[in-house]
């Protein structure tokens, strides 16, 4: 279908006057004015209701063509993909992480690493004290990110110690790819 084709080139949303989707211009304006006043740096705003863009705008110097780094928004997409895969029976919150990467398991995994589950990755309480040293462009490393994560020390019992852990999100994405045969992005596009 045309919608599927558009998604492969970038998401294209339908537009609609906000009134037709049941939103109030007074409330929209109040929100934008409050955001402008209270939030230190605003780049852009888009409100989608019932699958239609009903309001959008940009603060100078940004515009529609300005790319934005999403940072932690990736965690929301990844956890959505995990939830969908769970609903399809492809994995469980209580699955051990090592189950998905038998070729990457360290020679002598710690008991804490063996105990790490999908739910621990989602909650960012993997038992790590520090993040695994995963870098986008590290010419010195020949190991995969998965292998690097699994080789990183897990001094705490999973589920007992919180650490904001971006590599845990990568591991969730790798699990989704493992159980679906698709990248997280392609899997989400096929479902949403």
Role assignments for model-derived ranges:
Residues 1-22:
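N-terminal pre-domain segments of enzymes
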Residues 33-62:
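A short, well-structured edge-of-sheet supersecondary motif
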Residues 38-40, 61-62, 92, 111-116, ...:
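Extracellular/periplasmic catalytic domains that process cell-envelope and extracellular macromolecules
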Residues 44-47, 53-56, 71-72, 120-123, ...:
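Structural recognition of the beta-strand scaffold that forms the well-ordered cores
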Residues 51, 68-94, 121, 172-176:
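Active-site SXXK
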Residues 64-65, 130-192:
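Catalytic-site signature segments of enzymes, centered on catalytic residues
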Residues 69, 88-128, 151, 180-192:
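Active-site helix/loop module of the DD-peptidase/beta-lactamase fold
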Residues 71-77, 113-116, 162-170:
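Aromatic- and histidine-enriched alpha-helix N-cap/loop-to-helix transition segments
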